[in-house]
Structure formats: C-alpha cells, structure tokens
Amino acid sequence: GIKGAQATAAAMFLARTGSSKADIRTYVEREFGYDLSRSCDEIRPDYHHVESCQETVPQAITAFLESSDFEDALRTAVSLGGDSDTLAAITGSIAEAFYGVPEDLKAECRRRLTPELEALLLAWEARAA
C-alpha cells in the first residue's frame, strides 16, 4: 500500500519536474526496490489480476516507461490485462505528469460527464489552480 503510493507519487513528481524516463526508472528502482527490468511483452503472458502493490505498481510504471504519449501509456497499461483499471489509473497519473493530456481527449471526456459531474470537476479545477 504505502510503498506503492510513495513510488507512484515520486514518479509523478519526477515526471512533472522534467526528469527523463531513465531517471524516473533509476530513482524508483533504487528508492523502492522495484524491479523494472521486465518489458511489457515479458509481463503480459503470465500477468493476472493481483491486488498487491508489489505486483501492480512496477507493471504500471513499466507501461508508462514504454509509452510514447498519454494515450499510448493507457493502452499499454490496459493491454497487460489483470487489474487493468488500476494499472491504467497508476500509469495515467504518471503519464499525465510527463506528457499532459491532449485537449481533444479532455474535451471528449468532459462531453460524456453529466452536468453535475462537470460542475464538480470545474469547481475542483478552480480550487486546485
């Protein structure tokens, strides 16, 4: 739990402050002891639904490290299988910090919100700004 949250937060911070993917990988491996040496192609064949940070966070970070943009990061995370919504949430948080979210994707997501949820999102964005 806590170790996974700390590793994710550290990766997000490093991504947001301009660190390279290589630097993010090195930091996470060194500080949290996660093995990020397996590629997504190596993870995919035997990955299954796991609720443990030790078997979710490293895979999510690897999906980010192998990605070329925000959408690719999410698609790569989901393609691993297993607990794909959790993987995509972790990967997406790091990818957003590194790449940003394309405006067309933001617009499409907003279009799908109910008016109540859109108002809540706008209020949160105003408060976070």
Describe these PLM feature segments.
Residues 5, 9-12, 20-47:
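Small-residue-rich helix-loop
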Residues 17:
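Double-stranded RNA-binding/processing signature
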Residues 1, 45-50, 83:
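Solvent-exposed loop and edge beta-strand segments that line ligand/cofactor-binding
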